[in-house]
Amino acid sequence: MSYSRSMYSSSSVVGGSPYRSLSSAPRFAPGSSAASVHAGPGGSGARISVSRVSSVGSGFGGGFSGGFSGVSNVSLMGGAQNEKETMQDLNDRLASYLERVRSLETANKELEVQIRQHTEKKGPAKDWSPYYKAIEDLKKQVFDSTVDNSQLVLQIDNARLAADDFRVKYEAELAIRMSVETDIGGLRKLIDDTNISRLNLENEIESLKEELIFLKKNHQDDVNELQAQIARSAVTVEVDAPKSQDLGKIMAELRAQYDGLAQKNREDVEKWYQSKVEEHTMQVNIDTQELQTSKNSVTELRRTMQSLEIELESLRNQKASLEGTLHDTEARYAMELEMLGGTAMARESELVQVRSDCQRQQQEYQALLNTKMKLEAEIHTYRRLLEGDSFDLQDAVPTVTTQTVKKVITTTQRIVDGKVVAESNDTEVLKA
């Protein structure tokens, strides 16, 4: 943000020299040889009497302090006067003129010496082009720093967006992990139920085995008892009856029948036990495979989560580092910008001062030059008087000119965040 402020000042220049003038000696144009000159103190209030001129008026100035002032009336009256007195008066007046010319020449030499000393003291104008180059380089550095800051801000925004994406992925993976852990809990409960069922079946198998052993033992006892009874019975009865059945054969048949029944029951029990064992073994294998798969998934998810946490932590550290770097860079460039602004303001102030000094020196030089020209004109006029040449009274009267000079001072200030970081003053002289 910048704005300009202008201040105007004006000054009047009389005779091309502001506030300073040197008075010149009175200059006259005698009309004929029969003339008388009467001079007042300082060259003002002079009277010249000429027989053929009716009246002439002119203004003269005296001293080195003010403008041309002290206007006197010159009356030329006709009449015959004594030639000797006239020549005496003219010689006296001419002597005073010569003395005045010598004093003016001395003053002119002193002014030339002062001008030469002032010029040598000031020296040549300072070359500001190296500062312009340095200012351009600093502006380029500020621009490059601004671009670097923009890139850093963009990188920070990208890192923030990437961190947000990783956070979303982490939350999604965490939800999947929780669901998998829930499934694992259900599978563990199912495994526990399966183990309990397996233990119950094993207990049933053991009880069936014990029952089978008990049945075999009872059967063997019954067979032994029947065989003992058959052996103890030794009675032979001979009757006329049909041929009796063979008890041994019957017992063998019964034994074979019971053996077949027991074998069949054993086979049925073994088949049922084998089928149950195979079924539960298959279920256990399936559950074991699912559990292993779930464990692998959980391990992979845990590994992924750890890698994501590590990457998230690294991104957070990188973000903190970039933010610290950005803060330091902003502080450093703000300090450098403030220093550059102060340097630029100082250079602009020096430039304004140099311009003002140049203008003042130019005005002083112009005033001295005008004074020198006036003195040379007066000396030339005195020489013409000494040589006896005639001249118009209008040539002897100095031309008083008034010139108005208007100065326009433009102050430009650059404001950043409410602070003035740069200020420049530009002075322009307008001659009316």
UniProtKB/Swiss-Prot annotation:
Q: Which residues lie in Low complexity bias regions? A: 1-21
Biological processes annotated in GO: intermediate filament cytoskeleton organization
Q: Which PROSITE patterns match?
A: IF_ROD_1 (PS00226), IF_ROD_2 (PS51842)
Region (Head) location: 2-82
- Residue ranges of the region described as Tail: 389-432
What are the alphabetically sorted keywords of the record? Answer: Coiled coil, Intermediate filament, Keratin, Phosphoprotein
Return one GO MF term: structural molecule activity
User: What GO cellular component is one of the record's annotations?
Assistant: keratin filament
| Coiled-coil intervals, chain numbering | none
Start and end residues of each stretch annotated as Disordered: 1-44
Its post-translational modification remark reads: Phosphorylated.
Q: Locate the region Coil 2.
A: 251-388
Entry's InterPro entries? IF_conserved (IPR018039), IF_rod_dom (IPR039008), Keratin_I (IPR002957)
Say which domain of life the source belongs to. Answer: Eukaryota
Site (Stutter) residue list: Y333
**Positions of the UniProt region annotated as Coil 1B:** 135-226
Q: Which Gene3D superfamilies match?
A: 1.20.5.170, Single helix bin, Vasodilator-stimulated phosphoprotein
Location of the IF rod domain: 83-393
| Linker 1: annotated segments | 119-134
Q: What else is known?
A: There are two types of cytoskeletal and microfibrillar keratin: I (acidic; 40-55 kDa) and II (neutral to basic; 56-70 kDa).
- What is stated as this protein's family in its record? Belongs to the intermediate filament family.
Q: What is this protein called?
A: Keratin, type I cytoskeletal 18-B
Species of origin: Xenopus laevis
